[in-house]
Amino acid sequence: MRQSPHASGKTLNLRAQVVKTLLAVQNGQSLASVLNQHMNIVSDKDRALYHELVLGCLRQWHALKQVTLPLLSVPLENPVVETCLYVGLYQLLCTRVAAHAAISETVEASKQLGMESLSGVVNAILRRATRETEQFYDVLENASNLPSWLAKRLKKD
């Protein structure tokens, strides 16, 4: 399995690779170049899931943000944890990945990316989302998936 090592020398799991890709894109890197770079690291058997999670999270980014906000008691100021939540929620709400696998792998990804102290938060929020799934389908369905500045401008016009 070809996965990239991180600081401790262990390999990153698929969800951690997805989070790293999403963070790179959010920081202004080209999706095509980041995808090509990471596709070479991800194992052959995981490439389809990797591709689906990256593109799906990007497609649903603003909707996932709207789903996440009510689950938090205070806003997150940590892009790694926030992105882990989006990856986990996307799996739970938009794919057929088993809930226990989505949660476990996403929590492990947060640990692998240096967020061990906040991995409990990721776990708690994703578990809560599995209990309250129906209300989040409504949020996803009604979300515009447009950046707030663009949605406001379109409403104005």
Give the location of each predicted region.
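Class I Rossmann-like S-adenosyl-L-methionine
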Residues: 1-157
